[in-house]
Amino acid sequence: MITIDGAIQSDEITIACYINEVPLFLETELVRLYDTLYSSLPFFKVYRSTEQLSSYVAWCGNQPTTILLFKFRNGRIEVLNEMIEIDQAELDRFARYMFAKFSSANIISFKALKTDTHRFSFPIQKCYANDTYVITLPATPKEYTAALGKSTRTGIRYQMNKVVRDHPSFTSRFYVNEEIEEQHIREILKLSGVRISSKAFNFSHDEKRIIRLAKMCGLVNVLFIDGRLCAGSVNYRIGSSYFGAVMGQDFAYEKYGLGKLTIYLTICESIVRQGKRFYLGGGPFDYKSRMLGVQHEMDRLEIYRSYGKLMLNFDRAAKTVIDGYVRQLNVWLHKHEDKLGAKFVLNSYYLWKNLMKKDQQS
């Protein structure tokens, strides 16, 4: 490999690094490459700080093959891209380039990715980060409905017929981006918060950020009865992928299963709008499998310049291991949240999170 005008070139790959810069063309290229919310500029702008954000781009010919946005501070390169799959050769190339370019960098951190690290060039730590359930969408809503299990399909049809029979004014409407009414989102978040908090821990959504992101790439489904919002969901679209974010339903209409109907109607609408994938998010909820979601697990990855640097950062390495076990414990607790001991631990955890959030805001 040779260096030419600040870029590294091989026979097929050219690598460029834009320090404290995110070129405009990267927004569409990120969508083309990863097609995921958590590696998109709208998400970074709302949920991450874009100050002093730099860009790594590997080119094959005139087309990028890898784009990773990162921050470098205190000897650590923090990659913002999440929930993506990276080929090991690409990841190895990135690590070698970054350690060569930033001589004081000791660690490269990924929050959530899928990759093979067999015979990797550098010492690594790899532990469970999170998961998500993904539905591969067929060409039509009819095909999707037919693919559902018989009991799920029958249940949806029964609940839909029942709510229409009992409430002829029942309607489902979709709004995108600037069409979205902020009040609709607030009401959906409130309904969602009430349901989550009913499990005995105080919970609140980040309303401002959700509204801001929805205005940029949102798809909001609102269910009305007699002109009143009775259920709904906030979703996002990046490229050909849709992402379910928040779902809320009024307790008064619980017998109609409006939560399940909201999700089903949103998935069907995503298909109509040429969606290829629908992300149901993480968490061990049975309905996600029944709606044809397939679990995709992601790992946290820490890459060290050397074993010596790993030992010098032993405190961080230990924290990474502990965090991985805590995440796995959190998944187990949610699977068994009806048990008294698990419920107590979950309540304590969410109480601590809310106290930390208030402390950060004050």
What are these regions (language model features)?
Residues 2-76, 113-132, 146-255, 356-362:
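A conserved beta-strand-loop-helix scaffold within acyl/acetyltransferase catalytic domains
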Residues 2-10, 119-147, 276-346, 350-362:
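Active-site/acyl-donor-binding loops of N-acyltransferases
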Residues 60-63, 69, 76-109:
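N-terminal accessory interaction module
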Residues 53, 103-107, 218, 272-275:
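Short, high-confidence coil segments that cap the C-terminus of an alpha-helix
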Residues 95-96, 201-313:
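Aromatic (often tryptophan-rich) hydrophobic motifs at membrane interfaces
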Residues 90-136:
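Non-catalytic accessory segments adjacent to catalytic cores
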Residues 97-101, 158, 162, 269:
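A generic secondary-structure signal
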